Amino acid sequence: MASTAGRPGRVAKLPPRERILDAAEELFQSEGIRRVSVQAIAEKAATTKMAIYRHFETKDALVAEWMRIVAADYQAAFDRVEAEHPGRPREQIVGLARFIAEGLSALSHRGCPFINSLAELPDRSHPARQVIEEHKAHQTRRLVGMCAEAGLPDPGQAAAEITFVLEGAQVSTQNGSIDRAGERLMSIVEGIVDRHGSPLDTPRPAVG
């Protein structure tokens, strides 16, 4: 979603559905999913509850759509590092870690939207939780693929270690338990990739 800078003027120009999603994101991130009512979202979006229900059948459906947008942003990061470092899987993995590291300052104020949402959605049948679980599974598959392309002998193990570090850094930043989390994150991920031992600096030939 867009930055909150100059929010009133910017939001007024958005179509109704996007305005609702923008307001929902602001409130869900700052106050939590459960605490925010549909009425509060309507007021923030300068619309009505009836208008919200024209676009989203239920509040759960609105939460799920917000999660899809957040997930798409993360998937775009994979696309971006692959485009920036074609045929260089090591740089792709490190670039992904850098994307997370550079976003930690925002997490220190609001926390990871996936982690926060999972804590509020214990029911695994909730549509938003299903979106999160599907996103995480897809993200893992892509990271395993990067590790495999990098020639790591155990791509699944390497991807698991990297995932633990990426997600652990986000939680540690949110609770303030570890300083210089971004710097430490980068060092650990680079160490994982190098430790698994592969000549990753050599571009792999393009397929097709």
Regions of interest found by a model, annotated:
Residues 103-104, 163-180, 192-201:
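Amphipathic C-terminal alpha-helical segment
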Residues 75, 91-94, 124-149, 160, ...:
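Amphipathic alpha-helical packing segments from all-alpha helical-bundle domains
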Residues 2, 19, 23-61, 65:
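Helix-turn-helix
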Residues 65, 79-106, 155, 159-162:
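Hydrophobic alpha-helical connector segments
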Residues 1-15, 199-208:
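N-terminal intrinsically disordered/low-complexity leader segments
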Residues 91-92, 106-127:
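Amphipathic alpha-helical segments used for helix-helix packing
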Residues 63-70, 77:
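Alpha-helical DNA-contacting segments of helix-turn-helix folds
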